[in-house]
UniProtKB/Swiss-Prot annotation:
Xref: NCBIfam families: MPN385 (NF045751), MPN454_MG319 (NF045771)
Signal peptide per UniProt: none
The protein's name: Uncharacterized protein MG267
Keyword Endoplasmic reticulum among record annotations: no
Source organism of this protein record: Mycoplasma genitalium (strain ATCC 33530 / DSM 19775 / NCTC 10195 / G37)
Main location: membrane
InterPro entries cross-referenced by the UniProt entry: MPN454_MG319 (IPR054989)
Alphabetical keyword list: Cell membrane, Membrane, Transmembrane, Transmembrane helix
Places the protein is found: Cell membrane
GO cellular component labels: plasma membrane
Recorded topology in the membrane: Multi-pass membrane protein
Amino acid sequence: MTLLFKLVKIAILVFLMVIGFFIFIGSFWLNTYQTAQWADLLASSDASGIILTIFPNINSWFNATVANQPVLFKTMVHFFIPVGFGLLFGLIIAIIVDILYRLTKYAIKRSYQSN
């Protein structure tokens, strides 16, 4: 039973990471949820979402990172930087939800012990 519980918990955390990833790429980086356009937008354009409000210089940093590199490297980095940030954002969301779950579970357990 504990193995099944752990697998379900891992599946839920992966699901939360995917949701966080979609939120980051859709809202923060590209400002669109039309996933069919994501590959073209990631390869050709800079960030255009909410992230520009939070970090106004991110496009200049992003372009300076790949300025003197070969075309293949530029193409890979145009995908990996936003995807990496998206996965990190998803991981943070999953960790926060896990912490809130554990705190709620602890609070419920404490309330039953005090009665």
